[in-house]
């Protein structure tokens, strides 16, 4: 963390020397839309009450470090609401004069809030992964800090191809979110030259996944479910609903690595990351919150840091000016990922490396060596400009 802070201080001093500090209050609303959902299969993954908001607290500290030199103050207001009151929470914040927002929720929730806020506001999506939000369902006032399903699938695909695991067995769930994830892996296979030799669907029949599907039953059921698959190098689990994927490793009929929603998982960040200065980030987060960081915490932190960096460079809190700067060639931000992150100007998605995590350590980081792109290797992950049908950014 020390080096990024030093760079921020240098930027702050440069602005001060250019013309002195002017008072500016930057007010941001962080809205988390909480939908009813099943408890995670593992109690180790239960959601903390301050999920996302904890990352916002750390970002406020970081932004204040630079802001105090520039006369900038940051005020963050948070709201955790169910879907049916999310727009009311947004309306209240808009009525208080807020025009900058970070949203943690599913795709439909994010789109509803973006449409409600209108052109005079700027929203940063810190949670929704649906690729369609970066495609036909994009919005001009909505930028994406959370990686898309397409980016996550491409991160897995690059590593699989690098390992020469080109024959995939795809197991997907029966929910719409699972089908969307499966489609992202089909797309990735087609782009990177893998072959899906067989697909199977794991039907969600309900019941308690913790008790009704104990290890004795799992040990019997999963091998039977996966028996007779065509020869494959790798199992891809498309289980956005967290119904079955954690049970696949070590239980398949054929002993094969599992990637995707279980086994080796693509993530934006995790608590074991130590490289690129992340150790200090982890220690500061844990000292502040008393727990380990989750992806949602990191993504809210990153969204608020994106806003803070743009405010520092432009000396304004105007949504239109901040958006223009973020999408421009001068914007870049250190994000504890080994290289600066920037935005794609064709759909508002943040370019970023993605970590491949086995539950304990970073196994690898995508984009992988040798996967090239005319603009940036980071653009090998997710929708490229010719693929995107986003019209709002043209």
Which role fits each region the language model picked out?
Residues 4, 8-10, 22-394:
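Extracytosolic ligand-binding ectodomains
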Residues 17-19:
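N-terminal signal peptide c-region/cleavage motif recognized by signal peptidases
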